[in-house]
Amino acid sequence: MSEPDDKQYDAHYFRRWYRDAGLADPARLRRKVALAVSQAEYYLERPIRSVLDIGCGEAAWRAPLLALRPKLSYLGFDSSAYAVQRYGRSRQIHPARFGDFAWLRPCAPVDLLICSDVLHYVPTREFNQGLPGLAEMCAGVAFLETFAEEDAFEGDHDGFQARPARWYRRRFASVGFAALGSHCWLSPQLTDEASALERG
């Protein structure tokens, strides 16, 4: 979501990494969405009604979310001028960098907060600025899909911030998130709802 000076999240970038490279598997994305929705609904004890997608790119999560919950409210943010210009109106994508969430509160706290495949590209200073805002805006579960230096992953390594998994765990816990596993984190508002063995 943060763009180094020489890295552009333009049409070519999304085509290369999300279409041509074959990394965008629709069935896999649907399973991921179902996992996140199920976790949030389990802890909220009701269907989700609101989603905030930070670093949403072209809003790939939006269609599978709406297929599961047609009435939910979806709001996406991304730093890509291309994604905002091309899909802003039709997919509810607005401009913002990750660090903007130090002050940006675009909606009431949401049932499901998504920040998928973003945080491992955000420089540490900006990460520390924006992360508390994510905790404040999450009333249910956050899906924070992040790769650490221990991971061998396929995809874009340009701008990858090689930080150990324990670094992320500490940062997420410091703002009140509780680990649930599979990239899901329980919001600070609900941490008392989980038993000791549910929390990772």
Where are these regions (language model features)?
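Short catalytic micro-motifs in class I SAM-dependent methyltransferases
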Residues: D117-Y121
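Class I (Rossmann-like) S-adenosyl-L-methionine-dependent methyltransferase catalytic domain
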Residues: M1-P106, V122-G200
